[in-house]
């Protein structure tokens, strides 16, 4: 199961990223937990509990504590968390990779959904999150169900 955090001070972008992630997970039969945070300060207030997340989608330009500072705090807790910067500012890309971000995605890109899908695919391969499925035949058609969802 993927545990994902979205940290963005703009609700419209948090919701958009959330919907894209859920679409990916639904299409790929991957169970997940997704939590949203309205600021870097809110996220790093979790302290050591930040380590429960596999992936953090992180905006860079936020009030109080920006995304780069948030990423630095994440790295103090864990080097295993995949950091994905999703931002409107291209000029921070080099700094973003200094905290070992796996991707730097521009929010206003018309291919945002495809880019996030590709990003999760890449992370999934690294994490080796292979979902075993069982095929069931119904009158309405065939449905593949992840085995971990079956009792």
Language-model region placement:
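Helix N-cap/capping motif at the beta->alpha junctions
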Residues: 36-45, 67
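CheY-like receiver
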Residues: 50-129
């Amino acid at each position: 199961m993927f545990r994902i955090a979205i940290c963005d001070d703009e609700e419209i972008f948090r919701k958009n990223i959330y919907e894209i992630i859920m679409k990916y997970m639904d299409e790929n039969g991957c169970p997940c937990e997704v939590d949203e945070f309205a600021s870097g300060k809110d996220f790093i207030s979790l302290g050591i509990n930040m380590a429960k997340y596999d992936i953090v989608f992180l905006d860079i330009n936020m009030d109080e504590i920006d995304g780069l500072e948030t990423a630095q705090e994440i790295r103090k807790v864990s080097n295993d968390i995949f950091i994905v910067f999703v931002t409107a500012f291209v000029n921070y890309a080099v700094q973003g990779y200094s905290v070992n971000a796996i991707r730097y995605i521009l929010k206003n890109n018309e291919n945002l959904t495809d880019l996030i899908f590709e990003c999760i695919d890449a992370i999934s391969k690294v994490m080796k999150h292979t979902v075993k499925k069982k095929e069931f035949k119904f009158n309405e058609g065939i449905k593949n169900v992840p085995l971990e969802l079956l009792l």
